[in-house]
Structures are given as structure tokens and as C-alpha cells.
Amino acid sequence: MVLVMTIMQPDITKIPAQYRDVLTRNARRVVALQLTGVPEKKGAADAAEPTGSRVGGLAFVTDDYPEPRDSDGNRMIFLAQLNLAKLPPLEGYPTEGLLQFFIADDDLLGLEYNKLAGGSGSFVVRLIPASELGRGRLAE
């Protein structure tokens, strides 16, 4: 699977006038993600790119950004990656590189109630710089 990203622009004309000003002042740009099927077979004309946005499957890795391990040294589950250069720009977010999400492969899928503040080794969110994208591969 890969992701198609679009900017959502809600129609506020149907919202009562007394609320429109508050909604307009507090509006933030967001990106809507829509899953679309794409073959991952090598050589397929419409095959997914290793650095493309995806949910599940194989993660893109490099020598400097190998597959992450949990606090016990076990491989983590790859959830998703977003190619930021192909996203519409959002204020305060990087515009290039590969944003990846991983969780621990355990009974609670990385959730540790006593360590919710982070730093537990049960999940990883990382940004692979654009300069690394030309020298990587899909994890095996």
C-alpha cells in the first residue's frame, strides 16, 4: 500500500455564522492520507518506490539508519513511512526526508503504561534525511 496525500479544505458555509469566525481563527492545515493499492513486485510498472510513502510492508533503511530494535534488542514492527518531499508543505514540519514509525513487537505492541512519557524503547519515530535516500534499500 502507498499513500496519496491531499490538503483538506472543509466547506464552512453550512456552519452557523456565529461559529465561523472561531473556526476560521483556529483552523490549521492538515494532510489527509488515503491508502491506495500498489504492487511491491520489483519490475512492475506501477511498483512502489523504496522511499515512497507506505503503510506496512518493508521499511527503507540505510547503513546509518538500520532497522530499529526495542529495549530487549528485538526487531521492531514497521508501521509506516511518509516521504515528506511528496507531501504538501505544512508550517513547522520538514519538507524533505523520510518520516518513519515503528513499535515494539510484543503483546501490547509497544505500549508501556509505566513509561508513557517516552524514551522507553517501545516505539521509534525517526526522520531519515533526504541526503540518505540515495544510498538505502528496503529492509529484509
Question: Predicted regions: what is each one?
Answer:
Residues 86-140:
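Hydrophobic, ordered structural segments
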